[in-house]
């Protein structure tokens, strides 16, 4: 019985994109299909560790590639776990994977088709070279079924009880007319070597071997008759008569005989078992692509072994690009493959490395873990904890080595800086080493980024703190009023523009005995001479009345108004409490859909307003307030200064309309416009209309 199903909309869209768009790199389809077959073999082998009977009559796990020139088909077959009917329907058509939409978006943004495997939709790459695909699959839990589609929006699933598959999956590609090159033996050998040489199972390619054998005329006639029945003609080559008498009596000829047989294409032993000195850069790149489905080579490699009480070998690869779903909350990490004595155990062991290292790819092969270890036991296993600790240690070594190459480290940091910062937040043991990997723009670094270590070496004599500000962008922070005094004193300020920086700075307090000081918060004081301190005290006393008046006008909008020692050219700013949220953090938390309102209210407490006593506006405001505390223009100016301080300090306006009204009033003052006269002009047409209406009514009454 045959059933017809419609493809899920996103899958149908993806297939249409693959079929109707020209891509030169079509060869990746074979890599994707072999990779899927390898995964299927991994799954059945893992099951067999606890239940040997699942292998049944097909104990040998292998992958076969079979070209058929006569029927113009290419078959990829494995003896893996196979698929049930439900698997065929769901996995190959009706349920879109999370990566389907992401992959299409990546393609439309100019991405390479080679990335398809990273998004979990590699099977559909078959339609790059085939106009029809047939999938026959047999799972131990179900009968055999055949899935087939020509990508016309639907697919069929048919029960196949007479299938010769004992277990596994057979994918038959009916090749397009212009893709017949993938039936050539040499082409297939090259592709397997290029993309799949280090797959952990035998990849058997069906090849044709031609041999020559001598036959007598009688044997040759019989062979010719037999081949004639089969529609073939033997190729004959004459040989010279020998001197032997028997040879003269029985004339012999050489006949070419063609036999088909499977030949293993990936004969190299596992790469991680070899000495790193004997492995070439090309072999590492090939192996990395095989285990990661990446189309690019890795950025860097760490190949190491640990011996002693505990033995294991590992290869860690650092990709050039971050995975598209790296920080998805429900994503299961499958970046490190776990082997025990060369036997694959699993590729989603989340306890093998911490979450912040989830971008690393690689393999770990342990000599000490039991083959039949369960996922539950892994979490408590002491050996695994030691392996995890060593992976983190070697990863840090890899990053430190990479830091020696400025260009490569820049590529790494652009892609994975968030992971490094997440590590600082989560890994207190390695926090100091991770902090050395940080890079920031600063007021002195220009377009380059600086390390914390370099910042400390450039600190001014007597400078006790590492100064920094947080915000949306480097451009905004370069003109921030918070850094004015620091710049005037020749002190460098770090610019932290990544939202995760806010969380990082909650965990770190100092670096090389130098405390961090956020210039947007209270409690920041620059070193002053005795004369400067005296002058500051005099200014505070002189402006005490203005500060008090401003507080009375602003009321609950501010905690207090004080004389600033961090401003140089701006009239005023708003600073937060030392342990509260910065303006940037407030903005981040406001955008959190599930934020804790009570926590937000506590952390977003009233701000302190700081005024610059050297600024002309503040001086004039002081004069006006001292002359008349009820001066309306002075009150308007205080509110206007508060609102502009909100904006320049990185906060949002509570009442934009009131702010606009004040600006409009100031514009009128600048243009010497009279509010009362303007109101009379605005009311005149209304009054005229009213009088006109009244007059008309009166006339009607007279009539």
Swiss-Prot record:
Residues 224-247 have a biased composition (Basic and acidic residues). InterPro entries: HATPase_C_sf, Heat_shock_protein_90_CS, HSP90_C, Hsp90_fam, Hsp90_N, Ribosomal_Su5_D2-typ_SF. Its main location: cytoplasm. The keyword Chaperone applies. ATP binds at residues 36, 78, 123, 375. CDD domains: HATPase_Hsp90-like. One of its GO terms (molecular function) is unfolded protein binding. Pfam families: HATPase_c (PF02518), HSP90 (PF00183). Keywords: ATP-binding, Chaperone, Cytoplasm, Nucleotide-binding, Stress response. Homodimer. NCBIfam families: PRK05218.1 (NF003555). Belongs to the heat shock protein 90 family. The TPR repeat-binding motif mediates interaction with TPR repeat-containing proteins. This is Heat shock protein 83. It comes from Trypanosoma brucei brucei.
